[in-house]
Amino acid sequence: MDIFEYDGKFYSYFSYWDGLNFTKKVLDKFAVKFESELSTREKEIIRAARKSSYIITLAENGAKSTRRHEFSHAFSFTDKAYKTKVFEIVESIPKELRDKFVSGLEGMGYSIGDPAYENEEIQAYLVGYDQKEYRSFFPLILPEEVAPYVASIGEVYAKKESEVLV
């Protein structure tokens, strides 16, 4: 998808997002649904991902926080032990702070109501913590409120990253 329309305006993919993640199952559904409309480039991407279980897309010059965010989703999807550890950290967040996260996610257009999905996004935003982004995405959250969780989850992420990304 090179260009898409949102709210009456047209965007190129990476002018709107630095990164995105999805499962191979989602890609397969997309390929079947739009088979007759796929561009040559889209067909090549689908072919290249055929042996993957999880796909991450990143802008070449995207933010480091986005890279960490997207890889945290991949680690959570592909490594049960990693997911268990990061979800334990997320679930230790006090309700008042969690509500601030959920409010921010909802404000960004995330679907709210499934605690597991919310945990997944919260862990990814903790891993990809960027204070400037937080002021925009989570204006109700103060840096000192989130610091211990950023540190704890950052340790788990760094260990996994060192095992996987060389």
Indicate residue ranges for each PLM-predicted region.
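A metal-dependent hydrolase signature that marks the N-terminal structural subdomain at the beginning
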Residues: 1-53, 159, 163-166
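Residues that cap or delimit alpha-helices
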Residues: 21, 39, 80-81, 94-95
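Metalloprotease/metallohydrolase-associated module, dominated by Zn2+-dependent proteases
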Residues: 48-54, 91-166
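Short pre-active-site segment immediately N-terminal to the catalytic Zn-binding motif
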Residues: 53-68
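Short, flexible loop/turn elements at secondary-structure junctions
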Residues: 59-62, 72, 80, 131
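Active-site recognition of the HExxH zinc-binding catalytic motif
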Residues: 65-78, 124
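Short catalytic/ligand-binding loop motif for oxyanion handling, primarily in non-cytosolic enzymes
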Residues: 75, 83-85, 134-135
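Short acidic alpha-helical/loop segments enriched in Asp/Glu that coordinate divalent cations
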Residues: 81-91
